[in-house]
UniProtKB/Swiss-Prot annotation:
Cross-referenced SUPFAM superfamilies: FAD/NAD(P)-binding domain, FAD/NAD-linked reductases, dimerisation (C-terminal) domain, HMA, heavy metal-associated domain
The protein's name in its UniProt record: Mercuric reductase
Domain HMA: from-to ranges: 2-66
Lineage, broadest ranks: Bacteria, Bacillati, Bacillota, Bacilli, Bacillales
Further details from the record: The active site is a redox-active disulfide bond.
InterPro entries hit by this protein: FAD/NAD-bd_sf, FAD/NAD-binding_dom, FAD/NAD-linked_Rdtase_dimer_sf, HMA_dom, HMA_dom_sf, Mercury_reductase_MerA, Pyr_nuc-diS_OxRdtase, Pyr_nucl-diS_OxRdtase_dimer
Record GO biological process: detoxification of mercury ion
Activity regulation note: Uses NADPH as the preferred electron donor, but shows slight activity with NADH as well. Inhibited by Cu(2+), Cd(2+), Zn(2+) and Co(2+), with Cu(2+) showing the strongest inhibition. Enzyme activity is enhanced by b-mercaptoethanol and NaCl up to concentrations of 500 uM and 100 mM respectively, followed by inhibition at higher concentrations.
Biotechnological relevance of this protein: Presents to be a promising candidate for Hg(2+) bioremediation due to higher catalytic efficiency, temperature stability and salt tolerance as compared to MerA enzymes from other mesophiles.
Family note: Belongs to the class-I pyridine nucleotide-disulfide oxidoreductase family.
Amino acid sequence: MNKFKVNISGMTCTGCEKHVESALEKIGAKNIESSYRRGEAVFELPDDIEVESAIKAIDEANYQAGEIEEVSSLENVALINEDNYDLLIIGSGAAAFSSAIKAIEYGAKVGMIERGTVGGTCVNIGCVPSKTLLRAGEIIHLSKDNPFIGLQTSAGEVDLASLITQKDKLVSELRNQKYMDLIDEYNFDLIKGEAKFVDASTVEVNGAKLSAKRFLIATGASPSLPQISGLEKMDYLTSTTLLELKKIPKRLTVIGSGYIGMELGQLFHHLGSEITLMQRSERLLKEYDPEISESVEKALIEQGINLVKGATFERVEQSGEIKRVYVTVNGSREVIESDQLLVATGRKPNTDSLNLSAAGVETGKNNEILINDFGQTSNEKIYAAGDVTLGPQFVYVAAYEGGIITDNAIGGLNKKIDLSVVPAVTFTNPTVATVGLTEEQAKEKGYDVKTSVLPLDAVPRAIVNRETTGVFKLVADAETLKVLGVHIVSENAGDVIYAASLAVKFGLTVEDLTETLAPYLTMAEGLKLAALTFDKDIWKLSCCAG
């Protein structure tokens, strides 16, 4: 692939950007980033496609292609101001942009270094692409198996290549709107290249040395691989490459059944693959309350997904296009065959190329960057945020940390990063959403715990939806009845959990929930019903009574 930048006249809005991107896609261009504000487009072309075809495509789309140049690894060095930066950020995801925007608002001079595609994991290869495809999977799943008598629905063949193309367009649009366009909007420097520390206050990028008063490392994480014999010789998939497939595999084996493995496994099950989820643990979602694990497992089995738990992985091998996973389960040896193998066993921090030792930045046993409550590393001038620290790996946590760190590094404040109340959502069907303490965690912290467990078939919204596999669980302090944790398996659980987060964050009690009106026939009503369950038999209550 060769990367090019072309100046374009005639673009006046985001719609124009889409027209240009569509024209370039038709000739085979990849990783297209266009900006009407800058009047340019950056894209990659395979070696066998002449760059003149890009100029022709732009002209035929009724825009005027101007100067075009091949982008080298040194493309931004000329733009670098030799003066010191107030804040130099390594990475360009949610933490990086949150930090940069706030730093600009403080009046700081900001530079951002990115070695790959701007936008980080979430918009490019994580949340956005997976969730839009999950929605497509839900639609085809319902069309094949809807719960209503009298609705004769069916699903045609899935054109995965078209779905992937549509997904890629959405990713490009959001990357431009939420990231690329903001660089000009806030007027900070984007420096393309790989950063490496040379001392405690200097990095080297493309041969140029840059210094700053403060640094933020926000380089994220990438898929990690388990130690399984033969894996290095396999044509395996990761969460990134799976979402680039153009053909649905007949059989897909997933090693790892955390949130990534479950989401992507269920996605391809809905699209038509035979799915086997495999894990070492005896219990699905072992860090969650047992009622949550049981509900999710029941739902997956009902949908026809194969679960292999308590597996000891002996080896993997490939014969032609067939992948085989050899495991021992309950003393018996099994061989799982499939056409594709997805490895989804966690993520590792992107720290290897940073030369952190030169800057005096300490890392943990998994090479994650260690930080204190204020986001500082062992070098007080260098901060870190987001997945690179192996904290809660959510885009909203990264953005929050980036903002707090800028308040401290640039604003001179002493704000602590508070991750005591972090909602988490797994976008399976049904959705899993949790916030606060599990029952076991609450007991470990010394609470005398009282819980309520409400099966989903007691929630009117689930009943009318005819989808009643799931549960609401509330964990409370038995003495004060303050809500300590909320755990949900249901449709739209992710939309309900924000209300639960407020309850946990602000110390609301069970009584606060029961005395607050809840709209009938919403899934959020399940919160109130679960609260009522602490001292009432909700099966003996009329609708909305309490």
